[in-house]
Amino acid sequence: MDLEYGPEYERFRHEIEQFLAETPRDIDRRSFLLAATELGYVYRHIPKRFGGSEQPFDPIRETIVAECFDASPFPWRLGPQSTGMIVPTLLEAGADWQRERFIPPTLLGDAVWCQGYSEPGAGSDLASLRSHARLEGDEW
């Protein structure tokens, strides 16, 4: 198994590192994300009409971006809860009005999402939920 990225991906890594090195340290989050999106470094698989850069999904590039951003001096991370769970769900199953209303502010960090559920015996693993019904008189 070859775990090396290869020249194409190393060039991509170098581009991102150069972008991060040249970005002013006092840049605000919104401007930073807009610039990174315009260059195709973040939100690659999200359509342009929602604020993405509309490129094919590439898990290796996604990994390189995450590694470079995590190693950067910038305090922002690409909120996996918001952009990794909510946005793909909206793209796949959301109504048009939901996509238009929620995706753009989520990508810019203006909307932050979280999960708020926990069930006895399952925690946050909703796939392991169990239920049962019991007939009591005429009602279940």
Predicted regions and their residues:
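Mixed-charge, polar/low-complexity N-terminal
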Residues: 66, 72-74, 93, 114-116, ...
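Short, solvent-exposed loop/turn segments at the edges of secondary structure
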Residues: 60, 80, 84-85, 110, ...
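Glycine-rich, Trp-frequent "lid" loop and neighboring beta-strands that shape
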Residues: 53-55, 97-140
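Amphipathic, small/basic residue-rich leader segments at the start of a protein or domain
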Residues: 1-81, 98-105, 136
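N-terminal glycine-rich flavin-associated loop
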Residues: 77-97, 123
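Conserved short loop/turn motifs at secondary-structure junctions
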Residues: 48-53, 86-92, 118-121
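Residues at alpha-helix boundaries and the short loops/turns that link adjacent helices
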Residues: 26, 92-96, 109
